[in-house]
Protein backbone atom coordinates (compact mmCIF):
# COMPACT_ATOMS: atom_id res chain seq x y z
CA UNK A 1 0.00 0.00 0.00
CA UNK A 2 1.28 3.42 -0.90
CA UNK A 3 0.12 6.88 0.09
CA UNK A 4 -2.91 7.18 2.34
CA UNK A 5 -5.59 9.84 2.70
CA UNK A 6 -7.03 10.38 6.18
CA UNK A 7 -10.52 11.86 6.46
CA UNK A 8 -11.71 13.05 9.86
CA UNK A 9 -15.38 14.00 10.23
CA UNK A 10 -16.47 15.77 13.38
CA UNK A 11 -19.83 14.28 14.39
CA UNK A 12 -20.31 16.82 17.18
CA UNK A 13 -18.36 19.43 19.14
CA UNK A 14 -19.34 19.93 22.77
CA UNK A 15 -16.48 22.20 23.90
CA UNK A 16 -15.05 24.81 21.52
CA UNK A 17 -12.28 25.77 23.97
CA UNK A 18 -11.01 22.19 24.15
CA UNK A 19 -11.20 21.92 20.36
CA UNK A 20 -9.15 25.11 19.98
CA UNK A 21 -6.45 23.84 22.35
CA UNK A 22 -6.44 20.46 20.56
CA UNK A 23 -6.03 22.17 17.16
CA UNK A 24 -3.17 24.31 18.48
CA UNK A 25 -1.28 21.15 19.48
CA UNK A 26 -2.44 18.74 16.77
CA UNK A 27 -1.49 20.79 13.71
CA UNK A 28 2.27 20.94 14.44
CA UNK A 29 2.26 17.33 15.72
CA UNK A 30 0.70 16.05 12.50
CA UNK A 31 2.93 18.15 10.24
CA UNK A 32 6.07 17.12 12.16
CA UNK A 33 5.09 13.47 11.71
CA UNK A 34 4.80 13.88 7.94
CA UNK A 35 1.10 14.64 7.49
CA UNK A 36 0.12 17.16 4.82
CA UNK A 37 -3.18 18.98 5.31
CA UNK A 38 -5.16 19.02 2.08
CA UNK A 39 -8.36 20.59 3.43
CA UNK A 40 -9.95 21.45 6.75
CA UNK A 41 -13.00 23.33 7.92
CA UNK A 42 -16.73 23.34 7.31
CA UNK A 43 -17.77 22.03 3.86
CA UNK A 44 -18.68 24.70 1.31
CA UNK A 45 -21.43 22.41 -0.03
CA UNK A 46 -22.93 19.00 0.80
CA UNK A 47 -25.22 16.55 -1.02
CA UNK A 48 -27.42 13.60 -0.17
CA UNK A 49 -26.91 12.77 3.55
CA UNK A 50 -24.01 15.23 3.89
CA UNK A 51 -23.79 17.48 6.93
CA UNK A 52 -22.14 20.83 7.46
CA UNK A 53 -19.69 19.57 10.10
CA UNK A 54 -15.98 20.19 10.46
CA UNK A 55 -13.96 17.90 8.20
CA UNK A 56 -10.19 17.43 7.89
CA UNK A 57 -8.33 15.72 5.03
CA UNK A 58 -4.66 14.77 5.48
CA UNK A 59 -2.23 12.99 3.12
CA UNK A 60 0.32 10.53 4.53
CA UNK A 61 3.15 8.58 2.90
CA UNK A 62 1.76 5.34 4.37
CA UNK A 63 -0.82 3.96 6.79
CA UNK A 64 2.02 3.10 9.15
CA UNK A 65 3.17 6.74 9.18
CA UNK A 66 -0.37 7.90 9.94
CA UNK A 67 -0.80 5.37 12.73
CA UNK A 68 2.59 6.20 14.24
CA UNK A 69 1.65 9.88 14.24
CA UNK A 70 -1.62 9.13 16.04
CA UNK A 71 0.17 7.02 18.63
CA UNK A 72 3.06 9.49 19.04
CA UNK A 73 3.61 11.56 22.17
CA UNK A 74 2.91 14.92 20.52
CA UNK A 75 -0.47 13.88 19.10
CA UNK A 76 -1.45 12.06 22.29
CA UNK A 77 -0.85 15.34 24.14
CA UNK A 78 -3.27 17.01 21.71
CA UNK A 79 -5.85 14.27 22.33
CA UNK A 80 -5.58 14.82 26.08
CA UNK A 81 -6.33 18.51 25.49
CA UNK A 82 -9.42 17.58 23.46
CA UNK A 83 -10.60 15.47 26.41
CA UNK A 84 -14.01 14.49 25.04
CA UNK A 85 -14.71 17.94 23.58
CA UNK A 86 -15.64 16.40 20.21
CA UNK A 87 -16.85 13.15 18.71
CA UNK A 88 -15.02 12.32 15.48
CA UNK A 89 -14.86 9.60 12.85
CA UNK A 90 -11.53 8.68 11.24
CA UNK A 91 -11.27 7.01 7.82
CA UNK A 92 -8.11 5.98 5.98
CA UNK A 93 -8.20 5.47 2.22
CA UNK A 94 -5.53 4.27 -0.14
CA UNK A 95 -4.65 7.23 -2.38
CA UNK A 96 -5.15 6.83 -6.10
CA UNK A 97 -1.99 7.16 -8.14
Predicted regions mapped to residue ranges:
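C-terminal structural segments of small proteins and small subunits
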Residues: 66-91
Amino acid sequence: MGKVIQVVVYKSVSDEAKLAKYAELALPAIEAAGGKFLARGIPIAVREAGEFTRTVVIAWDSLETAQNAYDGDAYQKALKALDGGAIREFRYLEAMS
